[in-house]
Design a protein with these regions (language model features):
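Conserved active-site and cofactor/substrate-binding residues in soluble primary-metabolism enzymes
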Residues: 44, 48, 65-69, 80, ...
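Glycine-rich phosphate/diphosphate-binding loops that line cofactor/substrate pockets in enzymes
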Residues: 72-84
């Protein structure tokens, strides 16, 4: 059993293979397409999700991951004896998800539920593979034996200097 856990939201767009290979926990966003609400990566595959978006006449709406859901996930980590929890999330300026994770960790520390578990929560300031890529790289580095402090420093440097350019296509 690893003494660390990596967690991200489903906006990171990593492959299911990397998710499984590195034991990364993906917390899904709820997405409303028309009158239907689905949980990304749970109720629908990435390919089917993209197809649904192109067929939907309305702009999809997403719902932030709640503080309550983060507390549930963090409590699971504590129960499993995880020492360090790295959480990498979608741009905090575009979603309240990051703030909810920070609040959940702070509440757990304040009331003692965190125990000795340390939470390292990153606002990626990016979208999609702008934080999915460093998430997988962090997993690779940890599996290769790099220290937690080294990987945390690398992630801080990445998110402090990352620039993301998007190209739209149809």
């Amino acid at each position: 059993m690893k003494d660390y856990r990596l967690i991200a939201d489903s906006g990171c767009d990593i492959t299911a293979e990397d998710e499984e290979k590195y034991g990364i926990d993906i917390m899904p966003f709820d997405v409303t397409l028309g009158s239907e609400t689905i949980r990304e990566r749970v109720d629908i595959s990435g390919v089917d999700f993209l197809k649904k978006i192109t067929e939907c006449e309305e702009i999809p709406k997403t719902s932030q991951i709640t503080e309550f859901r983060f507390e549930e996930k963090f409590e699971e980590c504590v129960k499993d004896g995880v020492k360090d929890v790295i959480v990498i999330l979608i741009n905090g300026a575009g979603s309240h998800t990051y703030a909810n994770a920070v609040n959940a960790a702070e509440h757990m520390k304040e009331d003692g539920r965190a125990g000795d578990t340390r939470f390292h929560i990153f606002d990626s300031h990016t979208y999609s593979l702008g934080y999915g890529y460093p998430l997988v790289e962090a997993a690779r580095k940890l599996e290769a034996g790099q220290s937690m402090d080294t990987v945390l420093g690398w992630l801080e440097d990445w998110f402090d200097s990352c620039e993301l350019y998007l190209m739209l296509f149809n």
